[in-house]
Amino acid sequence: MALLLSLSLLATTISAQQIGTPEIRPRLTTYHCTSANGCTEQNTSVVLDAATHPIHDASNPSVSCTTSNGLNPALCPDKQTCADNCVIDGITDYAAHGVETHGSRLTLTQYRNVNGALSSVSPRVYLVDESDPDEQEYRALSLLAQEFTFTVNVSALPCGMNGALYLSEMSPSGGRSALNPAGASYGTGYCDAQCYVNPWINGEGNINGYGACCNEMDIWEANSRSTGFTPHACLYEPEETEGRGVYECASEDECDSAGENDGICDKWGCGFNPYALGNTEYYGRGQGFEVDTKEPFTVVTQFLTDDGTSTGALTEIRRLYIQNGQVIENAVVSSGADSLTDSLCASTASWFDSYGGMEGMGRALGRGMVLAMSIWNDAGGYMQWLDGGDAGPCNATEGAPEFIEEHTPWTRVVFEDLKWGDIGSTFQAS
């Protein structure tokens, strides 16, 4: 695994109580492509989410700054005291957390064998721009009138698993501030349309229990049995975040704590899952499916605008697959649609328009969004929303984490050759 050492030069100019040991991030080669000049290698790495890092009392490393109920109240009665008391340490062994890279390939593993026992690590990583060695930021992707392409191997993802690749409108700096000098270098700043309440928001103590909300574009949520792509837009204006990326929802209604999809963000979104939309023979394990998930394949997602420019309004999200050198057009579903549009969403996700529809999602894509990749399973719902019932062929119990751990302890996802750029510039096929 290629490694990149972050020397954390910031640590020489700010309190060492906030940044602890250095971070060693794995290199991941990615590519930016243009129609005129082809694809150019990018200087990028990945960083694990800050919550994976040790965050502890500066004077006693054995005391964590979080508990099972959130922040440690003795160390974090307010934001400033929390920042003074708590240290975030770097991670030097990414493989121990289920993350390995080799050139342009990223492998995420759900379980690790620790002293003969399986441990669930469920890593989530973000793409980091390493072009400035002194102050790393996330690589923000602006994808209006552009496409994003990657090769994926989901053959080791059974029912109940989710190997995800998606975009979050988090701050490129990771919310770096006087109270959070670590920033993107240590994986801070995460948010999404689910508005989860976590101990930290932008690397600062979440004293008031707010939810961390932002626009989210799920390019890829999948296992070997089912797949979907889903935009999740939010109703806040960018200036309401004060440049911090995260919108902090403060009330049960705004955060949609009841799960009724009537808060500040569209938690349900408008998804394109071929199985759920009536084409049950398109995606699955074996040569009887148009996309055979027992073998690797390439995924192309195009964000098309009304005028074909990066300043136009998003009108369509189109999907292509490439396998064995052949382009496979996206599934045609029972309605006759083969892409995600406002028209399709009006019939399948009536709430989507009230969150701004395609145009609302497009505004976030135009501003720039951060790439996240993860692997996880679902102890509460067994991932049935993705691959069971009307959404896929999996039965009601085979997605249980304990079943996966017993029968597929090696479960993993491999992402490779991440490329973004002009429409038609990121892939070649007959």
UniProtKB/Swiss-Prot annotation:
It catalyses: Endohydrolysis of (1->4)-beta-D-glucosidic linkages in cellulose, lichenin and cereal beta-D-glucans. One of its GO terms (molecular function) is cellulase activity. It is an enzyme of class 3 (hydrolase). The keyword Zinc does not apply. Optimum pH is 5.5. Disulfide bonds: none annotated. InterPro entries: ConA-like_dom_sf (IPR013320), Glyco_hydro_7 (IPR001722), Glyco_hydro_7_sf (IPR037019). Gene3D superfamilies: Glycoside hydrolase, family 7, domain. Residues 1-16 form the signal peptide. GO terms for biological process: cellulose catabolic process; glucan catabolic process. The active site is at 216 (nucleophile), 221 (proton donor). CDD domains: GH7_CBH_EG. Keywords: Carbohydrate metabolism, Cellulose degradation, Glycoprotein, Glycosidase, Hydrolase, Polysaccharide degradation, Secreted, Signal. It comes from the Eukaryota. Optimum temperature is 42 degrees Celsius. Pfam families: Glyco_hydro_7 (PF00840). Belongs to the glycosyl hydrolase 7 (cellulase C) family. This is Endo-beta-1,4-glucanase celB. It comes from Emericella nidulans (strain FGSC A4 / ATCC 38163 / CBS 112.46 / NRRL 194 / M139).
